[in-house]
UniProtKB/Swiss-Prot annotation:
Organism: Dictyostelium discoideum
Site, as annotated: Contributes to redox potential value: 33-34
Matching Pfam families: Thioredoxin
Molecular functions (GO terms): disulfide oxidoreductase activity; protein disulfide isomerase activity; thioredoxin-disulfide reductase (NADPH) activity
Protein function: Participates in various redox reactions through the reversible oxidation of its active center dithiol to a disulfide and catalyzes dithiol-disulfide exchange reactions.
Family of the protein in this entry: Belongs to the thioredoxin family.
Cited SUPFAM superfamilies: Thioredoxin-like
Lineage: Eukaryota, Amoebozoa, Evosea, Eumycetozoa, Dictyostelia
Gene3D superfamilies: Glutaredoxin (3.40.30.10)
Record protein name field: Thioredoxin-1
Length: 105
């Protein structure tokens, strides 16, 4: 099983992908224990929900982006459809992540 998660390395790359049809963004940090715990789940779900673009953003590396600069806790997940944010939540909950993906299929 391959990893479909795109590790975003620039503000331009994030902006480009946010315009995709269905996007889920994992905003996290390397120092965050819950972020490390949910990461394999996020990768697994990327193979189940193949109609979504799965993005990983390290908030410490992209902190100049307007969206990233507003993140107050990690992990935080944002869900986008055609460039518009449709949902978000914070916390390392597999059940909420899965149900939010299901609701936005």
């Amino acid at each position: 099983m391959s990893n479909r998660v795109i590790h975003v390395s620039s503000c331009e790359e994030l902006d480009k992908h946010l315009r995709d049809e269905r996007v889920v963004v994992d905003f996290s940090a390397v120092w965050c224990g819950p972020c490390r715990a949910i990461s394999p789940v996020f990768e697994k779900l990327s193979n189940e929900f193949i109609t979504f673009t799965f993005l990983h953003v390290d908030i410490d590396k992209l902190n100049v982006h307007p969206i990233v600069s507003k993140i107050k806790s990690v992990p935080t997940f944002h869900f986008y459809r055609n460039g518009s944010k449709v949902s978000e939540f914070s916390g390392a909950s597999e059940s909420i992540l899965r149900s939010t993906l299901e609701a936005n299929k």
